[in-house]
């Protein structure tokens, strides 16, 4: 039958095989995840409508009054689309005659289907940069700051500071990132000839020349930071004074001059050839600072990290420092004491990790500044819904003339609002508050000798206005308690209801019930079912038992076509599926299903599908159980057993799919594993145990009472093979045979029960040892260990001694001796004639 079915399908579909080959040769494109720039976030969320207006920016934090004109809130119909198909907030519908008018002139809503609200996104523009919580660990590497220092910075307890130039834009316009690849040629142009002579990396200034200016210059130049000195807190702002300020920041400008000279292939030796001393060079540079530098610009939180990354040379200064040390070590130009040699080796070894990050940033053309957020994408409204539990319409929760905020609505207990909406609202509110406050203080971020006291009096406001934005962004993307607690010890009492942690975007994606696994990877498809598997050894290897009710549901379209071709009125084209159950017990359905299943293979899959053997095809057989029946030999390929495992059934629809299922995926084809070549269709576990259990010789061939047991079994009075039964046995034959042939493949009976002089005596036996003998006359033999092990029965003297003892007690002919065994043991020994 199987051969006939395969040949008939192949003959009907001769040209399908070529189609399969062409399909397998199609190219597959990979999915790459990368950091997106703020401008790309804005471009993907903005939409240009037919009237020329651009929408997408969310500015209002309210959830109500969706019919308001020019509304830009989180559920705006102008941004995300109408609530009702092709209907605006005014109640107007799309004019089929005049299709050129697609936007309502009154409320500004496009005439689109409501499903667009599941696709359109928006964005929130932040006035101040914030660090993305996913990239905190990466920023530690790029900034060479400890985790504690970085969290102090994000918690607004420390800050960055930068020299503020009058011509700041022109000063930072050089393309300094090319120096990363030219640094290997540094010795050719003799670039750092005045700096490499000394140990400029350590704080021990005794090794430097006596010139104090040169000592400070080399020390600050060796810090490796451009525009950043770590751990500067609010209490040390008074250090900004005249010449000391210049010495503290000159090294950073000196690097700029050095890199610029290197790009132009100019050596610093030109100053020596022109009789210009290094001291005069420093004084001239200080005059430049005095004229060009007007104040110190400091930044906190994400603004400071953004400004650090925005500088051209800042991103590569750290790796340049490591490359410089490696070049010096290779050329034996570092003359330091032994106590510093190990430290330099450690730093050079760790530099490989930093180069790894910089390499990927450069190759993927990703700017490190994108790790800070300037635009926040807003999900489509249907993915973050508001559910009305009272049955009212949430669009009209605002009464006449009054505006209800989200907190007031939530206290009513009528609405269920997604936590993501709460975080969006908090971000918009605090972003507006911070912008309105700091716009009135334009000089707050610039320090000089005149406004230090003024800035000190306003610094606490930075933390008050900017910290809530960072907390809300962290909670929006990731609710990890460690990440949240690092920013502030204050709990989210205003965001957490009933002590339940809010759900972030990451939480909605990950896990078993996340968007990816629940809606994409584990998506239910049509013509599929799922049930528990049970063992069915009576089936063929290529057969599978499918429940009758499941087959009626899966093959309903094929049944409809089958009866339609035969002009049968039982099923019509638009027949209701629920009425099919009424006819499910009819014989005509059973015969029709059986004829359909002959030419329709099914595909069975067991999750997780780790290799191609996890999905195979079978020929279905109807069963009246509610479980899928499988042959035990095919389970090793699926890595399945019968302890509650479930499998899914898929019905191939097209002829190509049927042909592929039979030719490429049939279970009878997977006799050997494709990876190792080892056999797959082998008996394992319960099959081997069953063979061993049912094929042991129980010495019941001489029993006179086994005929009645077999007769009762054949007549149906006994049908349980594993329930213990007590049967009478011929003790003389059994004991004699057992004692005569102790080393054969016999097993000792489970239990022997004898009735001697009205007292019940029990002998419990094991395969190797006598565990308990209650014959008083044999105590002496037990103490002498004559019968502790059955191998001792090879001693003929002991065998005759035991037999003579039993004969004297008339036990070998006693009919009141019973054997405790099972029906399966009796039947299989008789059936196999062992």
Swiss-Prot record:
Keyword Cytoplasm applies: no
Residues given in the record as Mg(2+) binding sites: 641, 643, 645
Localization of this protein: Plastid
Cofactor binding, note field: Binds 1 Mg(2+) ion per subunit. Binds 1 Zn(2+) ion per subunit.
Pfam entry (one): RNA_pol_Rpb1_2
SUPFAM superfamilies found in the cross-reference section: beta and beta-prime subunits of DNA dependent RNA-polymerase (SSF64484)
PANTHER family (UniProt xref): DNA-DIRECTED RNA POLYMERASE, DNA-DIRECTED RNA POLYMERASE SUBUNIT BETA
Family the entry assigns: Belongs to the RNA polymerase beta' chain family. RpoC1 subfamily.
This protein's name: DNA-directed RNA polymerase subunit beta'
Native organism: Helicosporidium sp. subsp. Simulium jonesii (Green alga)
Taxonomic placement: Eukaryota, Viridiplantae, Chlorophyta, core chlorophytes, Trebouxiophyceae
Gene name for this UniProt entry: rpoC1
């Amino acid at each position: 039958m199987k051969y006939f079915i395969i040949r008939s399908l192949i003959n009907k579909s001769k040209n399908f095989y070529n189609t399969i080959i062409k399909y397998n040769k199609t190219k597959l494109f990979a999915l790459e995840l990368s950091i997106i720039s703020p401008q790309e976030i804005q471009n993907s969320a903005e939409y240009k409508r037919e009237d020329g207006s651009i929408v997408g920016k969310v500015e209002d934090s309210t959830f109500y009054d969706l019919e308001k004109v020019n509304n830009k809130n989180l559920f705006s119909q102008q941004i995300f689309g109408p609530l009702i198909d092709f209907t605006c907030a005014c109640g107007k519908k799309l004019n089929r005659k005049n299709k050129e008018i697609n936007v309502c002139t009154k409320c500004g809503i496009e005439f689109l289907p409501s499903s667009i609200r599941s696709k359109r996104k928006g964005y929130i523009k932040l006035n101040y940069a914030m660090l993305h919580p996913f990239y905190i660990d990466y920023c530690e590497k790029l900034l060479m700051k400890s985790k504690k220092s970085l969290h102090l910075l994000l918690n607004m307890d420390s800050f960055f500071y930068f020299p503020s130039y009058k011509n700041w834009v022109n000063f930072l316009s050089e393309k300094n990132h090319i120096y990363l690849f030219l640094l290997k040629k540094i010795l050719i142009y003799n670039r750092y000839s005045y700096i490499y002579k000394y140990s400029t990396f350590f704080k021990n200034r005794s090794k430097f020349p006596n010139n104090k200016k040169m000592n400070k210059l080399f020390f600050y130049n060796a810090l490796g930071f451009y525009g950043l000195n770590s751990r500067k807190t609010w209490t040390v702002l008074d250090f900004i004074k005249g010449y000391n300020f210049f010495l503290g920041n000159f090294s950073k400008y000196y690097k700029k001059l050095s890199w610029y000279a290197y790009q132009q292939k100019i050596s610093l030796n030109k100053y020596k050839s022109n009789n210009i001393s290094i001291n005069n060079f420093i004084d001239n540079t200080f005059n430049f600072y005095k004229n060009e530098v007007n104040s110190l610009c400091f930044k906190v939180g994400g603004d400071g990290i953004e400004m650090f990354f925005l500088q051209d040379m800042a991103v590569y200064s750290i790796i340049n420092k490591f490359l410089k040390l490696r070049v010096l070590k290779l050329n034996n130009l570092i003359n330091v004491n032994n106590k510093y040699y190990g430290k330099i080796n450690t730093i050079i070894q760790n530099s490989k990790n930093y180069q790894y990050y910089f390499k990927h940033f450069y190759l993927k053309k990703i700017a490190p500044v994108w790790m800070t957020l300037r635009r926040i994408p807003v999900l489509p409204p249907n993915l973050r819904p508001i559910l009305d539990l009272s049955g009212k319409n949430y669009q009209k929760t605002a009464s006449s003339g009054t505006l209800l905020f989200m907190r007031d609505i939530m206290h009513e207990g009528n609405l269920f609002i997604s936590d993501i909406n709460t975080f969006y609202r908090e971000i918009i509110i605090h972003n507006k508050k911070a912008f309105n406050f700091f716009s009135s203080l334009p000089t707050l971020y610039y320090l000089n000798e005149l406004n230090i006291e003024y800035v000190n009096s306003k610094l606490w406001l930075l933390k008050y206005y900017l910290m809530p934005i960072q907390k809300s962004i962290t909670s929006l993307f990731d609710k990890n308690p460690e990440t949240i607690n690092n920013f502030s010890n204050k709990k989210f009492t205003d965001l957490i209801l009933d002590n339940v942690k809010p759900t972030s975007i990451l939480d909605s994606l990950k896990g078993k019930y996340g968007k990816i696994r629940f809606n994409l990877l584990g998506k239910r498809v049509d013509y599929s079912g799922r049930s528990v598997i049970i063992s069915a050894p009576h089936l063929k290897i290529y057969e599978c038992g499918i429940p009758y009710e499941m087959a009626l549901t899966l093959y309903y379209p094929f049944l409809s076509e089958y009866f339609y071709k035969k002009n049968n009125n039982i099923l019509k084209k638009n027949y209701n599926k629920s009425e099919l159950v009424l006819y499910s017990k009819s014989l005509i359905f059973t015969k029709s299903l059986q004829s359909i299943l002959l030419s329709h293979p099914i595909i069975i899959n067991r999750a997780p599908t780790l290799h191609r053997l996890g999905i195979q095809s079978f020929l279905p057989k109807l069963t009246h159980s509610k479980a899928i029946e499988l042959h035990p030999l095919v389970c090793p390929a699926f890595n399945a057993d019968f302890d509650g495992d479930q499998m899914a059934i898929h019905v191939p629809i097209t002829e190509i799919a049927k042909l592929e299922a039979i030719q490429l995926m049939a279970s009878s084809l997977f006799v050997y594993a494709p990876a190792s070549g080892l056999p797959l269709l082998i008996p394992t576990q319960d099959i081997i145990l069953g063979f061993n259990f049912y094929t042991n010789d129980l010495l019941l061939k001489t029993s006179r009472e086994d005929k009645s047991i077999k007769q009762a079994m054949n007549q149906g009075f006994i049908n349980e093979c594993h329930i213990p039964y007590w049967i009478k046995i011929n003790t003389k034959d059994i004991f004699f045979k057992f004692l005569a042939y102790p080393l054969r493949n016999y097993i000792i009976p489970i239990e022997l029960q004898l009735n001697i002089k009205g007292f019940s005596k029990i002998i419990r036996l094991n395969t190797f040892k006598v565990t308990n003998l209650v014959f008083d006359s044999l105590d002496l033999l037990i103490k002498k260990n004559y019968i502790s092990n059955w191998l001792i029965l090879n001693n003929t003297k002991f065998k005759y001694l035991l037999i003579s003892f039993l004969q004297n007690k008339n036990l070998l002919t006693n009919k009141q001796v019973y054997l405790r065994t099972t029906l399966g043991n009796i039947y299989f020994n008789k059936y196999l004639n062992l």
